[in-house]
A protein has these predicted regions:
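A polyampholytic, Gly/Pro-enriched intrinsically disordered region
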Residues: 56-57, 115-131
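N-terminal glycine/serine-rich phosphate-binding loop of ATP-dependent small-molecule kinases
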Residues: 1-96, 124, 152
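Surface "functional belts" at beta-alpha junctions
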Residues: 99
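Conserved donor sugar-nucleotide recognition element shared by glycan-biosynthetic enzymes
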Residues: 55-58, 62, 106, 135, ...
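Gly/Ser/Thr-rich active-site cleft segment
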Residues: 11-13, 123-202
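Short, charged, surface-exposed secondary-structure boundary motifs
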Residues: 42-46, 108-112, 183-185
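Carbohydrate-associated surface elements
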Residues: 103
Length: 202
């Protein structure tokens, strides 16, 4: 079996790292080649502020790790926290830094959402734990608090897919990270139109 050279980028809540993996046909060896801090930043508006991921800096750190690996990488996998996302406009440009799941804008959104869609139905469709950091509640808050910006959005990409898009130009929605959103129909393994409509994105 031919040798394989792989990279894994792991973005945690406070730090990130890039790990190089080599498979020689018999065994795998792993080496951490780049580590970096991951600290949120605050974006200030006229009336509100939001805690965000410093996405462009994190993307630069990802590129540094790729460069350190050399030019013989066969594949790369990207792992991040769930639920958070970036908004793209019609031209595919990132509208703003992705908001951090620790931002307080979703406080009370579970109660507001329950007035639009019954929680028993929501759980039956998604099987997801009820947490106000879930993408479903984040999108409801986005639509309420940053209505103009939300109105310019053409597409939502979850964070691993957003990094992948910046690397490759390809837009995808990988299933396992999408399953953290509370937007998926667990039985059909596809987006739930009822929930998307309730979130105002369908």
């Amino acid at each position: 079996m031919a040798e394989k050279h792989m990279l894994a980028a792991d973005f945690g809540g406070s730090s990130g790292r890039v790990v190089k993996g080599n498979f020689d046909g018999n065994q795998i060896s792993l080496e951490e080649i780049h580590r970096f801090a991951n600290e949120p930043v605050t974006l200030w508006g006229k009336e509100t502020s939001v805690m965000c991921w410093d996405f462009l800096r994190l993307f630069c750190e990802l590129k540094k790790g790729i460069l350190k690996a050399g030019g013989n990488t066969d594949s790369i996998g990207i792992d991040t926290w769930g639920v958070d996302y970036g908004l793209l406009d019609q031209s595919g440009q990132l509208l703003t830094n992705p908001i951090h799941y620790r931002d307080l804008r979703t406080s009370g959104m579970r109660r507001e959402a329950a007035a639009q869609i019954e929680e028993s139905f929501l759980y039956e469709i998604t099987g997801s734990q009820f947490m106000e950091i879930n993408t479903f509640y984040q999108l409801l808050a986005e639509k309420k608090i940053r209505k103009d910006l939300f109105g310019m959005a053409e597409q939502v990409l979850f964070l691993p897919d957003l990094f992948g898009y910046f690397l490759s130009g390809e837009r995808t929605a990988e299933y396992s990270i999408a399953s953290t959103s509370q937007l998926l129909d667990a039985r059909g393994k596809s987006w739930s139109e009822e929930i998307l409509k309730a979130a105002g994105i369908s």
